[in-house]
Structure formats: C-alpha cells, structure tokens
C-alpha cells in the first residue's frame, strides 16, 4: 500500500481527489482540520501523531518536523541502503504529499495586522515537507494546487501511476510556490525592518494569462501581477466588454491610469503609445471629454481613454462615434454601458481610481542582465512650494493652469513640453532628443488655440533660453519648469524681456 500525506486549508474538490487516491491503494495521513474533514466525508485517515509517535507541541509550531515524516519523503527507493535504513527505523515511505501553506499573504493584506500575527502565520513545517517531496520527485508526487487534482486523477485512472514527467513538473511548480511564499515573507519583514535597499531582492508575481503576442507579433508575452497588487492597478480592472487586452493595451492602460489619478476634478485623459495626446478638465465628465477630444481629434483615433468619473449616457454616445481601443472608468451607467457595448471589440474596463492611503511601492525597470529599482514619482504638486523667478508673477488663474499643465507633462515622455489653457492641453511635444524640438511641436499642435490663457510646462530645466524665447514669441504668458540649469539666468532674462511669468518647482519629472 502507498501512503499520502494530506494537509490543506483549501478543501475545494479535495474529497473526490482523496477518494481517487484511496481507490488506487493509498492510505491517507492527515492533520487537524483536514483529518476531521476527511473523516466526516467517510474517508479513513491516520493522524500525523500516529506516524511520528510524538505529539504536536509549542502551540502547533512543531507537528511534522520529524524523521518519520522527512525520512519517508526523502528516502530514494532505488538505493538499498536508504530502504534498509527506513526498515531499521520503522519508517514508512510517503509517496504523495498534498499540502497548503499558512495564509501569510492573506494575513498581511489586513491593514490592521501586527508583526506578531504575521510571524505566527509563517509556515515552517509545510514548506519543509513540500521541499523534501519536491527534491525527491522521482519517488514522491507533490501537490500544491487544487487545479492539479483532476489531471492527476485522470492519470491514475489511465496509467495506474503518476508519470515521471508529471512528477518533475509538479516538483518545479512546488519550488516556485515555496520560493514565492518566502519572497513575500522576506519582502514584508524587510519593510518592517526598514530595509529599503536589501542586498537580495526577492520579487514574486502571479501569472494572469499568456498573451497572443508581445509588443510585436513575433514576440511571445505573458501577463503577471504583483502578488500584492494595488487596488487601482490595471491588474485589478474588471473587463466589461471587448477583446482580450493585448500587451500594448495593458501598457497604455497603465500609463493612462497613472495620468488620470493626478487630477481631482472631472478629467479625461486620451493616450496613445504611452503618451497623452489630450487631457481635458471641466465641472462634469461630458465637457471634460469634449475638451480632451478637442485637444487632438486626430491622435485620439484608436486611443486609450481614462475618465475619473462615472460614464453617463451623453458622454458614452459621443465616445461611441469614434474608434477607440479602451475606455477605463470607475463606473458606467447602465444605458452608457449598453451603448458602448454595441462595439464588440471595444474594451471597457471598470476600475476605482480613488486615492487611497496605500503604501507607495518601489517600481522596477528591466535592463539586460538586471533591473533598476526606484521610488515612484509621487509628490505633492503644490504651487505654494513653487518659486516665482521673474519680474512678473503668475496670477491665481495662471497658477491653476500651470498646475494642470505640470501634472500633464509629468506623464509625457521626455523631453516633454505641454502647452495648455485652463480647460485642456493645447499641444504636446513628447520624446524628442532636444527640448527646443519638443517646444516647437507642442506650439505647432496648439496652433490657433493659443491665446492669452496659454501656459507652457517643461518636465526638466531649459538648458538654454531658446525655448523660452520661442514660447514667448508665440504668445505663451506663463511657464512652469523645475529650474536647476547652469543657464537659468539666461532663461529668466529672456522671460523678463517678453514679460512672461515663470516659476521653478524644484522638482524634475523625467519619463523614459
């Protein structure tokens, strides 16, 4: 007779699986609640204490850390000396292990969790058994996922045993499982210890789906989510309509979400290739849409739209007239959803953008052979902290417009220039190797919309005074930029020459 050790918290489909094991001549060893559950289901089980000849001690901290368990798991069946040792020590081999780990992740997801409670939910015996079983995969089947039950049942029925290929795959899966578990623990404890830059960085992500392709059709791609995702992450969006999100869709949607969360009032962000092409703000979301569309009615075609208010029918009917890839909003009125869903391919995503008191986590960027890690670019964008550096100071209304433009330029690829008025962006110059070209592009896009309310924002300092001169000659009345150039005085002098008000934020917003 073969022996299986079963100790799980996830009881889904457990009884049929264990009954199948019994049907194939397994005796069942179990612990605590799992044993009681199986006994009540009419399945005969053996307690772990009967196997170890030792009681559970230290409030359950020591149950399975015992040679009768690990000897039965680690003994290599093809080695006579191993099997002789088992016989001498009266240890029965264990042929299958099915174990869930303590719910550490669920524990630390509770904002009220204490360090003591978190530590008590660090599993020791479970990972030890899983690792022992996975190491000895040639002789032991190891199961960590209820989704694998059905396939194992089928294989037992068809072949009477689990193949070496399956055992090896389950072993690899188990080591991924325990590594991810330990990574969460390491990350949590490192944060509790105030370790911002640990010498070993452990990250864990869960596969959401395989993708049709990546950035281009010849590239394979997969979509993973952080094991502890943010509530407002694209990974948490609920898809209400449309085709499956593509690799590029997800990156664009992420950029749109980051941008729209900057704004408190009703705002619409239109985005293409991770750059905003139009941002509109108003007292209501319909008018904000009108302004975002007006900002660049050409580039918005095939774009991603993020709205930070519920989508009503009037707004939906206007958006329905265009070809759009994605619309993201916190809510959709029923009639608005009905209208937009008429386009079967239009991806509609529902996601709460509310600014919650979540921890601001670091973000990573992949490079060849490594990664870069940095704090997120989040800062209180408060004009009260800005410095007026010119003879003319911006008016209160200009300051509000400068703040709007400053938030917009923050989410535009460097070198970035945004021209805006108090209602919308007028022109966006993104991703140019030099700042004067970005300035010219932004002002060209603004065109006839330039008026005495137009302001300009630059994500980094002006290396020379040419951008200020060009902006002033085209009617810009106020400028916001970080400052910090060795030639700041030249830019200030040029602004004074044309009577342009200019403020320094002291903060740069490069975006690569």
UniProtKB/Swiss-Prot annotation:
Organism this protein belongs to: Ligilactobacillus salivarius (strain UCC118) (Lactobacillus salivarius)
Keywords: Hydrolase, Multifunctional enzyme, Purine biosynthesis, Transferase
Species classification: Bacteria, Bacillati, Bacillota, Bacilli, Lactobacillales
Gene name as annotated: purH
Family membership: Belongs to the PurH family.
Cited NCBIfam families: PRK00881.1 (NF002049), purH (TIGR00355)
Stored SUPFAM superfamilies: Cytidine deaminase-like, Methylglyoxal synthase-like
InterPro entries in alphabetical order: AICAR_Tfase_dup_dom_sf, Cytidine_deaminase-like, MGS-like_dom, MGS-like_dom_sf, PurH-like
One of the record's GO cellular component terms: cytosol
Protein name: Bifunctional purine biosynthesis protein PurH
The UniProt record lists the keyword Hydrolase: yes
Pathway stated in the Swiss-Prot or TrEMBL entry: Purine metabolism; IMP biosynthesis via de novo pathway; 5-formamido-1-(5-phospho-D-ribosyl)imidazole-4-carboxamide from 5-amino-1-(5-phospho-D-ribosyl)imidazole-4-carboxamide (10-formyl THF route): step 1/1; Purine metabolism; IMP biosynthesis via de novo pathway; IMP from 5-formamido-1-(5-phospho-D-ribosyl)imidazole-4-carboxamide: step 1/1
Catalytic activity, reaction form: (6R)-10-formyltetrahydrofolate + 5-amino-1-(5-phospho-beta-D-ribosyl)imidazole-4-carboxamide = 5-formamido-1-(5-phospho-D-ribosyl)imidazole-4-carboxamide + (6S)-5,6,7,8-tetrahydrofolate; IMP + H2O = 5-formamido-1-(5-phospho-D-ribosyl)imidazole-4-carboxamide
Chain ranges of the MGS-like domain: 1-144
Gene Ontology terms for molecular function: IMP cyclohydrolase activity; phosphoribosylaminoimidazolecarboxamide formyltransferase activity
SMART domains xref list: AICARFT_IMPCHas (SM00798), MGS (SM00851)
Membrane-spanning segments: none
This protein's domain notes: The IMP cyclohydrolase activity resides in the N-terminal region.
